[in-house]
Amino acid sequence: MQVLLVRHALPLRSEHGQGSDPNLSDEGIAQTARLPEALARFPITRVLSSPQRRAIQTAEPVAVARKLPVEIDDRFAEYDRDLAAYIPVEQIRAENPKEWARLVQGHLPSAVDEDAFRARVLAAVADLVGAVDPEDTVAVFSHGGVINLLLHEILGTARMLSFQVDYASVTRLLYSRSGQAMVASVNTTEHVWDLLPRNQRLLDDDAARKG
């Protein structure tokens, strides 16, 4: 079985008290528009998503293109789903240095139960692997923490958060009939390279130099 782990596109920010479930930003919507073509070569048989809006909205263009429903599995939600706000990870460094230090060290935010997060994500994947045909390709629209956890479990990295997982990126996992997992690719972003925040800054700087 092949699993395509797609991180959600760029969301809006939510402030304290607004919850951690924002919609996609305009930039994020532009990123999602490129996913149907980027995934066109894969014979996707099911589309699964986290219950969070940013993941569902990222999944919808692919589901529409394939004429498949978006199946929701709560267990693919991000570790932040019960937090009071959503701050894009690239903004945490300046606004909350203590939590940023935890992330750099490979830990989840202090308010998150890492063991519970790990247990629910691994259970979701185990159930998925057990429920589909070995020849199936399933697209799972989820989050950077979920994708990092799965890579950590498969590759045995020292830290849970070890990988750069960009918005609308694709990470490809292969599962044998016995459930053995292999990593085929990580953080494929060619389809949205020019739409990622850090790359847009590089492009802007380059344009300024040429101007």
Task: List where the protein language model places each region.
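Generic beta-sheet signal
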Residues: V3, D136-S142
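Active-site-proximal alpha-helix that buttresses catalytic centers in soluble enzyme cores
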Residues: Q2-I72
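Short beta-strand scaffold positions
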Residues: S49-S50, A119, F141-S142
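Phosphate-handling substructures
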Residues: A65-A123, G211
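Active-site signature of alpha/beta-hydrolase-fold catalytic machinery across serine-
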Residues: P61, L149, E153
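Short active-site segment of divalent metal-dependent hydrolases/proteases
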Residues: P11, V146-I147
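Acidic, low-complexity terminal tails and accessory targeting/binding regions
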Residues: E71-I72, E78-E90, G130, P134-D136, ...
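Generic structural signal for well-ordered alpha-helical scaffold segments
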Residues: A33-A40, R118, L122-G130, L151
